[in-house]
């Protein structure tokens, strides 16, 4: 697997030493897993060293409850920028996330995204080109292997003063979560752009937390939908961790 900088130079991907295997997200069992884990809004879960809250990234009290007084080194996230949009044949269109979640049927306000950045030192925001972000010297580009009806690449806005980079990986199956990023992409981001803890306020099916676990980092994850919290708990449990409700 290779990466390339903005000048086209191709470099070898960083190598991981025996990472913990990812069992993958069981999206098709989301409702069943919610019953198993009994996930509800307001819960905070301790997942090994990680923290996962079923909460709302728009609410300051939820963010502060999740982070306590910690200041992660990096916010890496993939915020929703449009919902309930499907293409012919049932495939996901360009603007999507959690299409079955009525309460998230909106575009994340710009001020929410700006506020979230204040909790960390740096940020990588996938889909940042859909917002009015400050100029950035370092854009990350994911060359996608999926359906030809979708865009060829996705862009991530960053706060870094570094050359832009492009990540390319072989085709891998769609896992059922509409904005899911491949694990290898997130591992690549964390390996190259973060040395400390990670904050993901739109955790989805938990891939950022998996990447953090593989690299020995701590992830603070927020997800508004209880069933996706359950998917993440099951996924992390499959990696040998024992999730428990905070304070119990």
Where are these regions (language model features)?
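Amphipathic, charge-rich alpha-helical segments that serve as recognition/docking helices
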Residues: 1-9
